[in-house]
């Protein structure tokens, strides 16, 4: 099911009406700037929500002062307030990131042109973040669990849902990215690596980056074919692999995928969320013997540090892949064609 995040219950329409108008104008200018540099609407919406929390805190606790007059002591007090109210370290880092991004905008854009921001310098980076601590039990899937889910969905003729699960399993993309695949991303001319992978056209991903996304063809094809046959038989025409119900000119909505996640959780009896399949995909590639550096390229990470976060294979199991019968053995290492 969609995982629950503790929310900061601080904003309200009444409080928003009383927030310092200069701060609200600053926020609007910042969001306009983000649109001008083509940040995604999801990213902009996140900044909007987070900054509303920040400005409401300033209203309640800091005398509704101008944003540019915040001190390091103010930021420490805000961080402590978040900790005291039970926010996760990841959530605190996100809120501080919103403050940091707005501060950078003030420093790089406004400090030269606006007298109110003359000589402004960002101070957020001087405040140490709380250590990252997991707040949820991570769902680690065995092959047979997810294959059982695919079998059940196929048996129920839920071909679109099965195709979605298979794409997440064998492509490892984030939930928002899974919405953005098109039918044309899975045609013969998109097959690469000796027939082992589909390589999509560039898709908008986190951080406003466009990446070519890879999917394991042999594993994914049965569920893709079932869904495309169902679409053909039922007159479903859309460029999107998963079209929006009632408006096939648009891709499926996140709210629909969240509802599906509840269904998958009931079927599996475990907490099903799309991001757990990103871990599954990375772990499966590693388990198959694909070098870490190649996995990093497949996912599109800029750093190998992310691999360590997403690889759920026990350390001893990874080491054991290269040894057998009392000696080094690399014969078990597979290529893409073998996965």
Language-model regions: role of each:
Residues 28-136:
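N-terminal core-binding DNA-recognition domain of tyrosine recombinases/integrases
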Residues 237, 258-297, 301, 316:
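Short, basic (Lys/Arg/His-rich) helix/loop patches that form interaction surfaces
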Residues 143-175:
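Basic, Lys/Arg- and aromatic-enriched nucleic-acid-binding interface segment
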């Amino acid at each position: 099911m969609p995982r629950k995040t503790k929310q900061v219950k601080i904003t309200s329409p009444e409080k928003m009406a009383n927030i310092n108008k200069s701060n609200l104008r600053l926020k609007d200018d910042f969001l306009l700037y983000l649109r001008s540099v083509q940040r995604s609407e999801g990213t902009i919406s996140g900044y909007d929500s987070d900054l509303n929390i920040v400005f409401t805190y300033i209203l309640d606790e800091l005398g509704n002062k101008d944003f540019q007059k915040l001190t390091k002591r103010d930021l420490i007090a805000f961080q402590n307030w978040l900790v005291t109210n039970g926010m996760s370290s990841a959530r605190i880092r996100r809120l501080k990131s919103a403050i940091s991004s707005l501060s950078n905008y003030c420093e790089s854009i406004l400090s030269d042109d606006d007298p109110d921001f003359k000589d402004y310098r960002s101070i957020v980076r001087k405040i140490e973040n709380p250590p990252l601590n997991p707040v949820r039990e991570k769902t680690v899937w065995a092959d047979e669990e997810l294959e059982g889910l695919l079998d059940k969905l196929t048996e129920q003729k839920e071909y679109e849902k099965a195709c979605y699960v298979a794409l997440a399993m064998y492509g490892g993309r984030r939930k928002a990215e899974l919405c953005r695949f098109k039918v044309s991303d899975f045609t013969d001319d998109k097959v690469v690596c000796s027939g082992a992978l589909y390589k999509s056209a560039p898709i908008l991903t986190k951080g406003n980056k466009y990446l070519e996304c890879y999917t394991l063809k042999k594993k994914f094809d049965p569920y893709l074919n079932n869904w495309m046959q169902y679409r053909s038989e039922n007159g479903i025409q859309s460029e999107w692999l998963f079209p929006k119900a009632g408006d096939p000119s648009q891709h499926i909505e996140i709210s629909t995928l969240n509802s599906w996640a509840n269904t998958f959780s009931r079927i599996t009896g475990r907490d099903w969320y799309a991001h757990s399949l990103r871990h599954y995909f990375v772990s499966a590639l590693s388990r198959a013997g694909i070098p870490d550096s190649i996995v990093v390229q497949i996912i599109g990470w800029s750093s190998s540090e992310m691999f360590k976060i997403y690889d759920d294979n026990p350390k001893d199991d990874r080491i054991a892949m290269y040894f057998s019968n009392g000696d080094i053995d690399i014969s078990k290492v597979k290529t893409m064609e073998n996965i």
